[in-house]
């Protein structure tokens, strides 16, 4: 009779995927010329979209996995000094499960008697912008260039955070053209990793070890 149960996490694979997409976007930008084929430009855009979505998915999966590890009392995450936190996170899970990503992180900090991230802090603002960009791509709604709302707001939030796509016509729309370049892809990966690292340090839990042959390099 089988007595061993196996529980597989995905968050670290999502981080590796995001970094791979960013590296591939960088490689295409180094190769591209003004005469580059539409096929290459399509690949480049796909890598950038993948990096954004996978970076946000890493944050989403990581916090979900943490709550479920609390329920399971995973000893590698919740040692003897964190049993109170594990019990509180277990109790909170059904309430918080469907809430936005950042709310889950902030709530975990509160349960651990740690100060939540100030909403005006750079790292919080960056992740909020990343999640909003991910949502805009996943739940995409086109907007007329004379009636920009969500896309205009995103450009204002993101416009100076990274270099714009060097392969895009500067007169084209911010989303999906000027925004989605290696600058955006790399920023997405680094934003997600930095936030998660700061979160675990703040909460006093061990950070996840991400085994990646390229060391999560973004170019």
Predicted regions and their residues:
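Charged alpha-helical initiation segments
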Residues: 1-49, 217
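C-terminal/domain-terminus segments
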Residues: 2-9, 78-79, 147-165, 200-219
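Alpha-helix boundary/N-cap detector
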Residues: 5, 9-12, 16, 96, ...
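Amphipathic alpha-helices that form helix-helix packing interfaces
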Residues: 18-21, 25-28, 51, 55-59, ...
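Hydrophobic packing residues in well-ordered alpha-helices of helical domains and bundles
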Residues: 44, 51, 127-130, 185
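Short, hydrophobic, well-ordered secondary-structure elements
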Residues: 44-70, 138
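Flexible secondary-structure boundary motifs
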Residues: 71-159, 163-174
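A hydrophobic membrane-anchoring alpha-helix module
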Residues: 134, 174-219
